[in-house]
């Protein structure tokens, strides 16, 4: 879901090779050139920018819901258009480790120290759970500053699931955290093209690794 990135054509080619039985859907905007994209495509109207604060929250809400309506599958991987997930066994990893009532997400961008910060780089879950997460979100109005991943996770946990317990006590009730590098094997276009962004993520990831066992309580898995 997202804009047509420089990497998107290659990402789709790899996904077709790695997941030959998967139904691949691109959910993007009616302003994007999709002439070279070889998969099912849904184009939506861009949301109006919010004021005084703006971010990609409403873009994700519109784009993901449009994609979910198109897909008829039991297990769905929601991912970005500028980011490879190289692990060919990512669905097996989900089946073997993630409870069916949880969403599998990367550790990078997820923390117990910042309430409701659950990474939105990608999500892997049953269709039922992903639809619960995305179908019940009020659009962000821009009246206050908040990151998309926090807005989305808080809406799901607090507004939909009606759970107001402390985040550090309940995060693992709704999300199954796996490793960004060794489990998902993610390669991110922004890391390749923006040194400042790469440095920021590297620092954050190093800090999370330091306290990984204490914070996330997950098993480690390594493939290829």
Q: Where do the PLM segments sit?
A:
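Soluble or luminal CAZymes and related metallo-dependent hydrolases
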Residues: 3-7, 55-66, 144-151
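Acidic metal-phosphate-binding loop of nucleotide-sugar-dependent transferases
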Residues: 79-85
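Short loop->beta transition adjacent to catalytic acidic/histidine clusters or analogous donor-positioning motifs
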Residues: 15-26, 39
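Short aromatic/hydrophobic "clamp" motif used to bind/position activated sugar donors
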Residues: 76
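Active-site-proximal specificity loops/subdomain of glycosyltransferases
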Residues: 26-70
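Short alpha-helix within the catalytic core of nucleotide-sugar-dependent glycosyltransferases
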Residues: 9-12, 73, 87-96
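Catalytic core and acceptor-binding pocket of nucleotide-sugar-dependent glycosyltransferases
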Residues: 85-91, 103-224
């Amino acid at each position: 879901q997202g804009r047509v990135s420089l990497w998107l054509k290659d990402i789709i080619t790899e996904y077709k090779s790695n997941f030959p039985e998967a139904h691949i859907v691109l959910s993007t905007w009616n302003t994007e050139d999709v002439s070279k994209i070889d998969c099912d495509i849904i184009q939506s109207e861009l949301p109006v920018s919010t004021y005084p604060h703006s971010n990609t929250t409403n873009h994700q809400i519109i784009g993901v819901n449009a994609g979910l309506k198109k897909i008829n599958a039991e297990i769905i991987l929601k991912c970005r258009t500028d980011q490879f997930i190289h692990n060919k066994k990512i669905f097996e990893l989900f089946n073997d480790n993630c409870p069916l009532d949880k969403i599998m997400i990367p550790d990078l961008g997820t923390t117990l120290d910042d309430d409701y910060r659950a990474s939105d780089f990608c999500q892997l879950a049953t269709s039922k759970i992903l639809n619960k997460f995305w179908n019940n979100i009020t659009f962000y109005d821009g009246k206050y500053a908040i990151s998309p991943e926090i807005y989305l996770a808080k809406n799901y946990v607090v507004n939909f699931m009606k759970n107001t317990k402390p985040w550090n006590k309940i995060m693992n009730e709704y999300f199954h955290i796996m490793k960004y590098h060794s489990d998902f094997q993610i390669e991110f276009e922004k890391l390749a093209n923006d040194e400042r962004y790469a440095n920021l993520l590297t620092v954050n990831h190093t800090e999370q690794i330091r306290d990984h066992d204490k914070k996330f309580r997950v098993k480690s898995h390594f493939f290829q």
